[in-house]
Amino acid sequence: MLLDKIEKANDIKKIDKSDYEELAEEIRQFLIQKISVTGGHLGSNLGAVELTMALHLALNLPEDKIIWDVGHQSYTHKILTGRKDGFDVLRQFHGMSGFPKRKESSYDAFDTGHSSTSISAGLGLVKARDLKGEKTTIVSVIGDGSLTGGMAYEALNNAAKLETNFIVILNDNNMSISENVGGVSKYLNNIRTATGYLDLKEGIYNALKSKPGGDGIVNRLRRAKSSFKQLVIPGMFFEDMGVTYLGPVDGHDIEGLIKVIEEAKRVKGAVLIHVMTQKGKGYGPAEKHPARFHGAEPFDIETGIPSHPRTVANYTDVFSTVMCKLGQRDERVVAITAAMPDGTGLKRFRNMYPDRFFDVGIAEEHAVTFAAGLAAGGMKPIVAVYSSFLQRAYDQILHDVCIQNLPVVFAIDRAGLVGSDGETHQGIFDYTYLSGIPNMHICAPKNKWELSDMMKFAVALEAPIAVRYPRGTAYAGLAEYRAPIELGKAEWIVREGGIALFAVGSMVKTAEEVQALLHEKGYRASIINARFIKPIDEEAVLSACEDHDMIVTMEENVLSGGFGEKVLTCLNDHDRQIKCVMAGIPDAYVEHGNVDLLKKEIGLDAVSITEKILEKL
């Protein structure tokens, strides 16, 4: 097999041109086989095989650098840089990351995981190169989805201003190029990338600039775009920004891609290559259902059906159901997502109430301020977003929502440890970054019924509130404990005295396990479902001091600025002396891996917490 010849970076350059297509097919089959076992981002990687091969053939890595936006489409890059064996443990505990990691390989130029960052990072590397007097090529690869994020345009605007050599590749997998459109696109691409065109353009501009008043003439020429040119030549939006546009280019034609990359290296200033690819290319189920195979669980190759289909509802399913009920009950309820209607569970709401559903693209900042405007206009907006992505809209939460005390509900999915996507996606900071904002309220449900109750409470609150819930199966235990939700009030599940286990959200289930372990050791333990992180139930905390010897706080959030620190502050403010143990996530980023294994690693499983308690007694 040709793929067996790829053992390290630049081995691809030893492959004969006539074998490029065969190698691409082998890479696709390798990816399908491996990801069917481990799970991972399949669709985007199948679509980027030829593009990645072309980049490795046209560039001199690692001196030249590639920055992958989001980074989930970097699997072929990992294969071509000698990491084939890592796919056996892809995204597994202590295994290979599913994203670029500088600590994993010198060929990974920049860590990514969130969208729309690659152009900014690439431009920074470009200016570092210039300041050091180097002549390397820097390429940022960004998808059409990521180009909906405002940061990408901020970076493009800056790139045009800096007038330094920089290549941006737009990997557009929104649609395939049909035969008719393909012919026209190829014709226009040949004109735009022809050496003569580039030489003529540069020659004219240089000649004019050498004359008195030439700069003004050049600027007027650049602004003078005829209506015909606007209609006929694609990419004029980028050209008007001062970024040279090349394309559209067939993203599955390796030699054509190499040619346009070589031409882009000749362009003075920033250049954008528009590449058209097909998401899921080469695997029928992924071509037919690209969204399903964006982030795939292990699946049967022949059918594409998940190997272990879910049989019980997860928290996203519960949220989806209650959203539809809320929408039916109140016509003022509107739903907002940042390009994730499926992942956040809003697809059903969208189908039922299309006029009250808003997908704003990968634009979390806009999503939050848009929600603030809706709230100011009398609506009841619910922003459904992953915890790690809400970080991108911190100023909007503070400035646009909370200062005005607007009733925006933040439904925070993937809160806590999420597992295989690693550091960039762990939702372990939201208690901390939200709790310091005046007017913000934060709560977390212990089980699926409480999530439904909290969402109903949140919509009725008339103030900013975040409801955070984890990834995975919705806990169905403790069904008999369903006291009405009251602002800032905890729920006593069991009161025995001895050790008071104050647990937040997903940690209530763990508290049950800790209590059982303590019983085995002869200790009594109470379980308190904290419910609210802000405001905390100070009355419950002080009450626990009366008949308990120790307070233990349990949270799936970093300890710094979290629930435990708020409990300690309460005790200090009221001059209460009692032994305390805080169980949470340490001051460190948590890598990828199975959530249960990660909890053991950081001491957040029931056994580790129990041992910590016993040491303190």
Question: How does the language model describe each region?
Answer:
Residues M1-L80, E239, V243-I258, V267, ...:
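N-terminal amphipathic, basic-rich helices that act as targeting or association modules
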Residues L3, N174-F319:
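Long, well-ordered, tryptophan-enriched scaffold segments
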Residues H41-L162, Y315, R332-V333, T337-A338, ...:
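Cofactor-binding active-site loop characterized by glycine-rich and histidine/acidic residues
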Residues K65, T277-L390, Q396-L406, A463, ...:
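Non-catalytic terminal/interface segments that mediate subunit docking, oligomerization
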Residues G86-M96, K161-M175, G196, C402-R414:
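A glycine-rich helix N-cap at a beta->alpha junction
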Residues I217-P285, P407-I412, Y431-E480, A606-L617:
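Structural signature of the thiamine diphosphate
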Residues K259-E262, H294-G295, G304, N314-R329, ...:
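Glycine-/acidic-rich phosphate or pyrophosphate-binding loops and their flanking alpha/beta elements
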